[in-house]
């Protein structure tokens, strides 16, 4: 009797099990990579917005007064919220500015902009001589 050549059912099942485990780990790694890329994009765009906001305050004719201010804008096809806090410093002509930027929530996300912020930028503004 001639022996048939090929794989047994057990060998095929073991190979499929190994392939399934490898495929699951590859899919999991690629999903994490996509999440990280999305988070990095959010942080980059938010930092650009915060930097722009700080530059806008620097270009104003009069230095900003102490207190909080907030607003919304569209940037890169998305809605964003920003909040600035201006504080006086020991130096009379110097102001400390904190800018928070967060993506506008789509649903019922809770929390302040400070808690949801993708970027937080601290800078100092001085009056022009």
UniProtKB/Swiss-Prot annotation:
Entry PTM: Cleaved by prepilin peptidase. Methylated by prepilin peptidase at the amino group of the N-terminal phenylalanine once the leader sequence is cleaved by prepilin peptidase.
Knockout-associated phenotype: Deletion mutant results in a non-functional T2SS system.
Transmembrane segments: 7-27
Compartment(s): Cell inner membrane
Gene Ontology BP, a term: protein secretion by the type II secretion system
Described function: Component of the type II secretion system required for the energy-dependent secretion of extracellular factors such as proteases and toxins from the periplasm. Part of the pseudopilus tip complex that is critical for the recognition and binding of secretion substrates. Type II pseudopilus confers increased bacterial adhesive capabilities.
Protein's recorded name: Type II secretion system protein I
Organism: Pseudomonas aeruginosa (strain ATCC 15692 / DSM 22644 / CIP 104116 / JCM 14847 / LMG 12228 / 1C / PRS 101 / PAO1)
């Amino acid at each position: 009797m001639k022996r048939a050549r090929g794989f047994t059912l057990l060998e095929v099942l073991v190979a499929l099990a190994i392939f399934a485990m490898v495929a699951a780990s590859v899919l999991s790694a690629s999903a994490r990579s996509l999440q990280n890329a999305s988070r990095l994009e959010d942080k980059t765009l938010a930092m650009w917005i915060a930097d722009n906001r700080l530059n806008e305050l620097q270009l104003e004719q009069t230095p900003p007064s102490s207190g909080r201010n907030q607003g919304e804008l569209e940037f890169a096809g998305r809605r964003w919220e920003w909040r600035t806090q201006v504080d006086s410093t020991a130096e009379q002509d110097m102001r400390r500015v904190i800018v928070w930027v967060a993506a506008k929530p789509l649903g019922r996300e809770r929390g302040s902009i400070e808690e949801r912020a993708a970027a937080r930028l601290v800078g100092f503004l001085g009056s022009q001589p």
